[in-house]
Amino acid sequence: MHDIVIRGGTILDGTGVPAVTGDVAIDGDKIVAVGGKAGPAKRVIEADGLLVTPGWVDVHTHYDGQATWDPVLAPSSWHGVTTILFGNCGVGFAPVRQEHRTELIDLMEAVEDIPGTALTEGLNWEWESFPDYLDALARMPRTIDVAAQIPHHPLRVYVMGERGINRQAATPEDIAEMSRLTEAAVRAGAFGFTTSRTYSHKTTAGELVPGHKAEEAELTGIGRALGAAGRGAFGMNSDFEDEAREFAWMTRLSKETGRPVWFLLTDRPTDPGRWRRLMQIGRAHV
């Protein structure tokens, strides 16, 4: 007898094969049969007329704060999502010094429209380093899996303080320290690094985010940390004001480090063909 059988659903297994009607059998924490007619079970979920699919992986979320206090992570868990990735757009809450907690809350509120009052109430700040933050996530029982990326803006503020907040150029020593911390984060389990270079991301005071004007030397230095760790992807959000220049440095970064570089594909009403053009340029640089 199986532990659970999902009975009579329309199964789409994610491989691209046509849908089939059948059962899915689960024993313990493993799916043991997909399709056909499963035997009896301790629990039967009737799925006639419903789709049965693998859990969705949402690669762009901002649960960085909520994941530290909420085991359910609604509404994602209500809609078939079983894995979420956060630390996107260069915003997050680690690494962090006590004196900069308010700045990181302000960034998240301004960039992602998450109320600062909720973040202030919910965050317990049981961490300083990014590995500490991952440990805090691991201690939280939860209904779905989570993964985190180390965000540029907290990293820059942690290393550079007010100079980082004010978008001053990073010194070689700053870059070396950001690289060291990034490598440590990735080795501890971070899925990569993200930054933002878009004018739509500003603080509540209307200032550009700390990493907006980061020079190529800084970004490459951080990217090398991913190469040294042998894992992780480099992600960014950009306005692509100079498309050729942006793609040129992204290509150099990927070739030098051996790590994948991705960017957020967005569109603009004033440039409706932008997303197609960016995809074409991206393919040309593969």
Feature names for model-found ranges:
Residues M1-H2, P40-K42, D48, V52-P54, ...:
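Short coil/turn connectors at secondary-structure junctions
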Residues M1-V5, I11-G55:
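Histidine-rich, glycine-flanked metal-binding segment
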Residues G9, V24, D29, G49, ...:
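Divalent metal-coordination and catalytic microenvironments
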Residues L50, H62-G65, C89-G92, F240-E241, ...:
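Acidic, glycine-rich active-site loops and adjacent beta-strand->loop/helix elements
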Residues L51-P75:
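Di-metal (Zn2+ and/or Mg2+/Mn2+) metal-binding site signature of metallo-dependent hydrolases
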Residues T53-H62, G164-R167, P260-L265:
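Short, basic, glycine/proline-bearing loop/turn elements
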Residues W69-G192:
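Divalent-metal coordination cores built from histidine and acidic residues
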Residues P131-R142, R167-H285:
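Histidine/acidic residue-rich metal-binding segments in metalloenzymes
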